[in-house]
Amino acid sequence: MKEELKREYERIKDRISPEEFEELIEKKKEELGDIGFMDDLTIASTVVDDILKEKNTMLSEKPEHRMDTISKLEEGAETPVTGRVMKISSPRTFTTRKGREGKLANVIIADDTGELRAVFWTENIKLLKKFREGDVIRIKDVNIRGGFGGRKEAHLMPRSTVEVLDPEDYPEFPEYREEITPIGDLVEDDEVNVIARITGVSRVRTFERDGREGRFISLDIMDATGSTTYTLWNNDVNLVEELGLKEGDAVKILWAQPRRRDDKVTLTHTSLTRVVPGEYDVPEFREELVKIGDLHEMRNVTVMGLVTKVNDPVEFERNDGTTGSVKSIEIADDTGSARVTLWDEDTRIKINKGDIIRISGANVEFDDFNQSYRINTNFNTRITLNPESDGALLKVLEEYREQMRPMKISEILEMEDEGEEVDVVGRIFSLSDPREFEREDGTGIVRSMELADETGKIRISLWDEKAEKPMNIGDAVRIENARIRLGLYSVELSAGRTTRIVNPLPEDMEDLPSFEELEEMLYQTKKIADLEEDDRNIRIIARVVDLFEPREFQRGDGTPGLVRTAEFADDTGSIRASLWDDAAEKPLSIGDPVKIENPRVVFRDDMGGGRLELSIGNSSRIEPASERDLEGLPSFDELQEMLYPHRDIADLDEDSRNVLIEGELIEMSGRRILSIKCPSCNERLDLSDENICNFCGELVDEPRYLLMIPGRIMDDTGEVMITFFGREAESILEMTTDEVVNIINQSADESALEERVEDLNGVTVRVIGNADMDVYSEELRFIPRKVVKKEL
């Protein structure tokens, strides 16, 4: 057909076929005869005008071209189809490439010329309610497409409709027969129909094939003749939830595919299978529960019990190189207890201590190691958590569950049986950083924390993988199977391999106070001036007014430790503190406001004139103070004025402590500024030939060096001896002790820095410190504790 004729045909293509159009043009030519002024285009226009003015009989409506049977359907046609319904699949869900969810169902219809699959899409699913198997229907406005294997399919469109016809008008259509096959007679054959009762529903399981993950779920079904398994795959898995299928339901399954597996014929759901729940004549199912006390080596048993212990999963490598996982739990009923072993996907079931669990299809084996029977699950095992009803046993287990509540911390603190396992719920009150340690089988990790509830708090040691678990102060946690450990001062807990740290259950949170409420309940806020020896459970709000660098030391057991000295002050006074290990590494700066909780208040008398000090260790907590905490706390400058009153040098005496003086340095001596001390006894070192301290007798591998710079300081009122030690000596010299040691060692001259020290003469300094009487010169001497200011 020429292009210009095609354009004319486009005007009436919905009325006649191209062949009809060409036929009409030829007829019109014969009618007009030899009329030279009319070409083909003019004749075609005349034909089109005639068609548009009157109703024409289309070629497709002529008997010889009409698509009125299934065998005559042609691909691409939009036409009604008529047939008897032979199969209706259950609707299945799918997800489009754009992420939208849709549904489809397959309906097989047949007439006396063949069968046709009709595909009902999301908009058409509601039409399935209008008919059932055996009905004769006409589906209007369907699109005929090529399907799998070259077979044609009818795809419904949004405007498609379904009309149920009188079957007596179509006696030639094949008859619908619904033959039910007893489960005991199943063979590996074509599709079958069964009526059965569901005796078990598995969890949804996953598998991997060709790099893609799939899903499946299995239903155990039975009738009077036998039992088998019915499996649904991938998107069809959703049918179980959509239809609300559960154990005990009766169902009719139409057009399932029998398959042989392990010498047993099972059923598989296909794209044409339909599941119809209903009231059917099949035997009732009652599964026999085996009491735990009656267990022996047996297969395919069902037990129910209360979960009394849950262990974390453990991964392992199979012989084929793949990774598996195993997890054990312990259950109990009114006759005894048993360990249950879960494998792979079952290890990911969220099972909590206190859950009631029913396990069906498990095997019982004798465990030689524990000399007891163990329940071993397998691929076909069904696990049901907290079943709705299972008779008297369920009530007994629910009563037992009430007795398994976690213990209050105050109750644990009263326990005396070391090694006993307990459960506890609380909030993390303090938390140290993990640290490594060496043991016989390699390196371990340990971390300490304090847990608190409304009754008290307790220290817990976390070991290895428990120490690496992400946690934050204030988090609410449930700790199961922690072991009692009798600590130096009180009962502690140890969280090791069999311990579980999980989120609390909803009922655990009912009475648990917030972190802020716990702080107020457990700690008493005290001013520094009100502290007493052995104070416990106190809180101090103060500022850092002095801070030394952390230093390492060796404990009595040979392990390394870390300690840092600091001084804190509030509006009532100041106090020195020792920060140990993790606390020594806290980021602190002079002037910082801090909140110190649960320090130990100790009495020190090792330097003459006893005083209280704070010991801040693993059971203590030191954190930045909040805005609310800062109410009433003076600024750093205000504290300096309050704590360190200015004194003229002429007014100094032996009782002048924590005073501030300002003056000019004079007579600064740099001849011997390095004191060598024994690291064991801290006495001035006088070595024998064998590098042994003559005072304590210890072998000295590396001495400790103390920098000290003597001189005098004067102001308008007088002058006094002054000696800078350690950190303060480094401050005015602007060198570290290590740098001084290196220079002196390299030069082999103790006075190598004499000129640098003498350059300090004439420098004005403002220092805080104490005055005392020098025993050698019997003259007053000032010992700076802090260099506040240095200027030329």
Swiss-Prot record:
Classification via CDD domains: SoSSB_OBF (cd04491)
One biological process term in Gene Ontology: response to ionizing radiation
DNA-binding residue intervals: 81-140, 192-273, 301-365, 422-494
GO terms, molecular function: DNA binding; zinc ion binding
Superkingdom classification of source: Archaea
InterPro entries: Cdc24_OB3 (IPR035203), NA-bd_OB-fold (IPR012340), NA-bd_OB_tRNA (IPR004365), Rep_factor-A_C (IPR013955), SOSS-B (IPR051231)
Keywords (A to Z) from UniProt: DNA damage, DNA repair, DNA replication, DNA-binding, Metal-binding, Repeat, Zinc, Zinc-finger
Chain intervals annotated as zinc finger (C4-type): 678-696
NCBIfam families linked to this entry: PRK12366.1-1
Function: Inhibits DNA polymerase activity of PolB, which can be overcome by RFC and PNCA. Stimulates 3'-to 5'-exonuclease activity of PolB at 30 degrees Celsius, but has no effect at 50 or 70 degrees Celsius. Bind ssDNA and replication forks; replication forks structures bind both Hel308 and this protein. Has no effect on helicase activity of Hel308; may help target the helicase to DNA substrates that require DNA re-modeling.
Subunit relationships: Probably binds DNA polymerase PolB. Binds helicase Hel308, in presence and absence of DNA.
This protein's name: Replication factor A
Species annotation: Methanothermobacter thermautotrophicus (strain ATCC 29096 / DSM 1053 / JCM 10044 / NBRC 100330 / Delta H)
Lineage: Archaea, Methanobacteriati, Methanobacteriota, Methanomada group, Methanobacteria
